[in-house]
């Protein structure tokens, strides 16, 4: 097992250091420039669209709303990356990793806008809802069905299996620390709950997510704000520590900046998923009048995940000063940091929070995989087999080592993201045109912009739902 963990780590170093970071930052800055800084200029519109329920499709009761699509994507984004991932990034990359998490969120949000807008543009009619995502725009937009199948397999493995094993691993570690519950028992409980909900389909997942997500996110944010207020005199010093470790001479000479950069981007990507090709799978299911609406909604999801929730965790850890001791890593470091601020109840609070955070991620991750199973095959047996396999991986994650679980997730994430970034760079011109169409309608006084496929006659035959 140690040899396998080391091998996976070596492959990850090559992918994440020499390929993925360059591609992520390159795409982020390119899309930011081409969209005229859409992620900064249209924040007000993003918030307004959360209440948008106007679709143009008959039988809308079978489709999900903009807010439900937002909730499912946040359910997947807001998971172990926000508590355990931030702790790991700070432990391995130092406080400077937090700065690079902010950078990848601020600029990478433009990639999230492009991929989700394209997913809406190329969505198709499913059985009870729209379906779409990178596999569909690779097939219909790029005319490369083989690429869509490759991406679908990568996503199924990454989200359905690898990421869900990480979520399960973190939940079990937190409950073992807080309540001394064995990972095997907790794994059985998680597996049973997962079976019950995922066999209810996208509507049940949407309902559960739209309830869990606001409660868990707001509860954690309020606790973090309380801790920040308690430590407000230390806040300038913590921010200075983050900036100094991101750019300081001492860190540059010691190679610390490179480690901070790599950890910040790696954990930031795992947390907010910008450019990864995951959120577009649920963005495509929303019933909206214009593809840009879901692009903006999913951009807001990136900001919510990293700039708000990940930052809360980072401040809690850095206020405690425990990151520099090396006594703990991952979720246990976050638990120890909260204990330092609010007493022994901190361990229990984090265990409960991670249960909601990570379990909602399991549900969101499951749906991403299901959408791609349906892309690969329409055989009726495929979905039940996939559902059982997901539950098997939830159980596997409960018993696996932390390093192996994270390593598998990282390598799968890297290959999948590279595949998606290539596609959205090639198809980005259509998202730019859609954004311009949306802006023109808004400037002309239209409060609710509407898109029809005759506005893009050159690709009209590929746009099934418009």
Task: Locate the predicted segments by residue.
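N-terminal alpha-helical transmembrane segments of multi-pass membrane transport
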Residues: 1-80, 91-96, 425-466
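Membrane-interface loop-to-helix entry segments
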Residues: 23-30, 35-47, 169-175, 181-231, ...
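Transmembrane helix-loop junctions in multi-pass membrane proteins
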Residues: 3-4, 34-39, 81-86, 95, ...
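Extracellular loop-to-transmembrane helix junctions
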Residues: 9-48, 91-128, 304-310, 411-421
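Helix-loop-helix module between adjacent transmembrane segments
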Residues: 27-32, 104-128, 134-169, 173-198, ...
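Alpha-helical membrane segments and immediately flanking helix-loop junctions
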Residues: 57-90, 118-121, 127-135, 139, ...
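Extracellular/periplasmic helix-exit of transmembrane alpha-helices
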Residues: 113-122, 127, 223-241, 255, ...
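Flexible loop linkers connecting adjacent transmembrane helices
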Residues: 37-64, 88-98, 102, 110-142, ...
């Amino acid at each position: 097992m140690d040899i396998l963990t080391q091998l996976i780590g070596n492959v990850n170093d090559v992918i994440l250091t020499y390929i993925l970071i360059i591609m992520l930052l390159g795409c982020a800055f390119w899309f930011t420039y081409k969209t005229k800084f859409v992620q900064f200029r249209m924040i007000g519109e993003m918030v307004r669209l959360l209440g948008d329920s106007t679709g143009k499709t008959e039988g809308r009761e079978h489709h999900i709303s903009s807010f439900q699509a937002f909730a499912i994507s946040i359910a997947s984004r807001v998971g172990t990356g926000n508590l355990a991932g931030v702790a790991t990034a700070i432990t391995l990359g130092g406080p400077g990793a937090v700065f690079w998490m902010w950078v990848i969120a601020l600029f990478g949000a433009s990639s999230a806008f492009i991929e989700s807008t394209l997913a809406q543009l190329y969505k198709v009619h499913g059985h009870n809802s729209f379906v779409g995502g990178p596999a569909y725009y690779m097939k219909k937009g790029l005319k490369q069905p083989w690429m869509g199948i490759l991406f679908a397999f990568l996503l199924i493995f990454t989200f359905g299996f690898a990421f869900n094993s990480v979520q399960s691993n973190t939940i079990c570690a937190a409950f073992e620390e807080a309540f001394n519950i064995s990972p095997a028992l907790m794994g059985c409980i998680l597996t049973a709950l997962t079976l019950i909900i995922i066999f209810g389909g996208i509507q049940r997942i949407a309902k559960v997510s739209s309830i869990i997500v606001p409660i868990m996110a707001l509860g954690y944010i309020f606790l973090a704000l309380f801790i920040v207020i308690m430590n407000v005199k230390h806040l300038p010093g913590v921010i200075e520590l983050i900036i100094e470790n991101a750019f300081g001479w001492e860190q540059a000479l010691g190679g610390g900046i490179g480690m901070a950069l790599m950890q910040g981007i790696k954990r930031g990507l795992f947390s907010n998923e910008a450019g990864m090709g995951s959120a577009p799978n649920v963005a495509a299911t929303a019933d909206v009048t214009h593809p840009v609406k879901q692009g903006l909604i999913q951009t807001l999801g990136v900001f919510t995940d990293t700039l708000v929730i990940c930052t809360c965790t980072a401040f809690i850890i850095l206020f405690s000063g425990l990151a520099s001791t090396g006594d703990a890593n991952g979720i246990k470091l976050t638990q120890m940091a909260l204990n330092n601020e609010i007493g022994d109840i901190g361990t229990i609070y984090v265990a409960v929070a991670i249960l909601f955070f990570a379990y909602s991620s399991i549900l969101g991750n499951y749906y991403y995989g299901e959408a791609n199973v349906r892309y690969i095959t329409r055989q009726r047996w495929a979905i039940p087999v996939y559902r059982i396999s997901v539950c098997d991986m939830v159980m596997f994650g409960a018993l696996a080592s932390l390093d192996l679980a994270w390593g598998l997730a990282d390598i799968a994430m890297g290959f999948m993201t590279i595949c998606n970034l290539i596609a959205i760079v090639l198809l980005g011109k259509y998202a730019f045109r859609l954004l311009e169409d949306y802006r023109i309608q808004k400037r002309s006084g239209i409060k609710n912009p509407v898109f029809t496929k005759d506005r893009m006659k050159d690709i009209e035959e590929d746009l099934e739902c418009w």
